[in-house]
Amino acid sequence: AFGTEVDLPSVHVEGIRHIGALDITYADELGYAIKLLGIARRAEDGIEQRVHPCMVPKGAAIAAADGVYNAVVAQGDFADKVNFVGRGAGGGPTASAVAADLIDIARGNRVPVFGVPAGKLLKAAPRPIERRFGAYYLRLMVIDKPGVIADVAAALRDHQVSLESVLQRLRAPGDNVPVVLTTHETQEANMTAAVAQIAALEAVVEAPRVIRIEQF
């Protein structure tokens, strides 16, 4: 998309293994859908490339891509946002793609994978995930006792992370209870440091779950 070489080792990749049913439920309550996205952005300090689960607003076109449908969102300097949605799996779409490749081979059409010959691709510095600036969803499982939320908020404050919302379900005193927080936009490095401090709290009984929130 940017006429640059793809530096595969620098692509940040996460799967969906850490996503649980609770996260899907809370995402819905918060007005989001969870999608596994591949994201590439060009910034002044390099090319950002990452693949991981995201929360996206339920009203976004990309949130409606379910089942065999895939979606691509492209944003340009003058065209603003352009959405492409279509079937990406199933007998018909797969057969069509294979047939198109066979026809290109038969005709001798050589279309570069990235739109231009590999020798003409430019080199660009990768932009590390630590520089991402955005909002976050954080789910904790904690012992329900006084002061826990204050300790969590203090850890976030220590790393310049501002809270946007907090959800907590009532349980019997002493039981473990899920606590869900969303943050305002902050840098990934700050969020990572805050989560590490929160995970070390005695009242936190499971590894914190973090999902990035993307606006499309």
Predicted regions and their residues:
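Mid-domain beta-loop-alpha active-site segment that forms a flexible
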Residues: 1, 94-97
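Substrate-binding/catalytic subdomain of NAD(P)-dependent oxidoreductase enzymes
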Residues: 1-64, 69-71
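Short acidic (Asp/Glu) and glycine-rich catalytic loops that position anionic groups and cofactors
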Residues: 2-7, 75-82, 132-133
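Structured core elements
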Residues: 35-36, 50, 73, 83-85, ...
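A glycine- and small/hydrophobic-rich beta-loop-beta segment
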Residues: 71, 77-79, 108, 113
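Glycine-rich phosphate/pyrophosphate-binding beta-alpha loops
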Residues: 80-82, 86-92
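A conserved regulatory-domain signal marking ACT and ACT-like small-molecule sensing domains
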Residues: 97, 102-216
